[in-house]
Design a protein with these regions (language model features):
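Juxtamembrane boundary at the C-terminal end of a transmembrane helix
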Residues: 164-170
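N-terminal signal-anchor transmembrane alpha helix
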Residues: 35-51
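Core segments of alpha-helical transmembrane spans in multipass integral membrane proteins
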Residues: 40, 55, 67-98, 115-119, ...
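Individual transmembrane alpha-helices with interfacial aromatic-anchor signatures
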Residues: 81, 110-116, 141-158
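Interfacial loop at the N-terminal end of multi-pass membrane proteins
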Residues: 48-83, 100-102, 135-142
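Transmembrane alpha-helical segments of integral membrane proteins
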Residues: 126-138
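Intrinsic-disorder-associated, low-complexity terminal segments enriched in Asp/Asn/His/Tyr and depleted
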Residues: 9, 16-18
Length: 170
């Protein structure tokens, strides 16, 4: 809520918003934007996994690590849907952290769950020192190519955004 007395302060070409408590509301805006970005990432990834579970093929060949030229595992429809559900849950946790569910669940619960998400994605970015992550063994597979250029950096970005989201928590 903006302060009724003054509301905004224009200094150096930058508008600063202050809440009634005097705290800059710009941090709240930044947190909301970060939350929306995280929710979109999780929602998009969830939809992609649902697409794969429904039989979609686009990008699927690059989604599973390979060992010796063969897929390291064969994801089943149920495990793919489980991953989609986990990503959808992460999206809902971020929405909860933004206050979209009111006071139904204590805000600290969403903070702890967001921390768990951040740590999970950090572990994924680091990897298993074998097939996935920044510290994987060198490979010329399609998965390794995309893991180095997209998957692991995205996991690290999600981690950093989640930590900033937590840091800016009111």
């Amino acid at each position: 809520m903006l302060c009724a007395a003054g509301g905004t302060d224009r200094t150096g070409g930058i508008i600063h918003f202050y809440s009634a408590s005097g705290r800059a509301a710009a941090g709240d805006l930044t947190r909301n934007i970060i939350g929306i970005i995280l929710a979109c990432i999780f929602g998009g990834l969830s939809v992609l996994h649902i697409y794969w579970a429904a039989g979609g093929r686009l990008g699927k060949a690059a989604a599973v690590p390979t060992a010796g030229g063969e897929p390291a595992f064969e994801p089943t429809t149920s495990t793919t849907l489980l991953v989609a559900a986990g990503l959808a849950a992460a999206m809902l946790i971020i929405f909860g952290g933004l206050g979209l569910f009111g006071e139904v669940v204590a805000p600290v619960t969403f903070a702890w769950l967001t921390l768990a998400i951040a740590l999970l994605f950090l572990m994924r970015a680091i990897g298993d020192f074998g097939l996935v992550g920044f510290f994987k063994q060198p490979s010329d597979s399609k998965f390794a190519y995309w893991d180095t250029r997209l998957y692991s950096p995205l996991c690290l970005a999600v981690t950093l955004l989640a930590f900033v989201f937590l840091y800016l928590r009111p």
